[in-house]
Design a protein with these regions (language model features):
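A short beta-strand micro-motif
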Residues: 3-10
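A short, exposed loop/beta-hairpin motif centered on an aromatic-Gly-Thr core
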Residues: 11-24, 45
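Short, mixed-charge low-complexity intrinsically disordered segments
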Residues: 14, 30-51
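Short amphipathic alpha-helices within nucleic acid-binding modules
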Residues: 25-29
């Protein structure tokens, strides 16, 4: 299973980070969420991808 952490700016994809380990993906999700905490234009989400 692969995991993508996607950063959206103004509801458009800005960057993608791909991980094969769920813990690494969650850590990156948390790190980016803290980084963009005060910016309302940015959102971060975790998506599970097949394969």
């Amino acid at each position: 299973m692969k995991y993508k952490v996607i950063v959206y700016y103004d509801n458009m994809p800005d960057s993608e980070h791909i991980f094969s380990n769920k813990n690494d993906a969650i850590n990156e999700l948390h790190r980016l969420s803290v980084k963009y905490r005060n910016s309302r234009m940015y959102t971060v989400e975790l998506v599970e991808c097949g394969g």
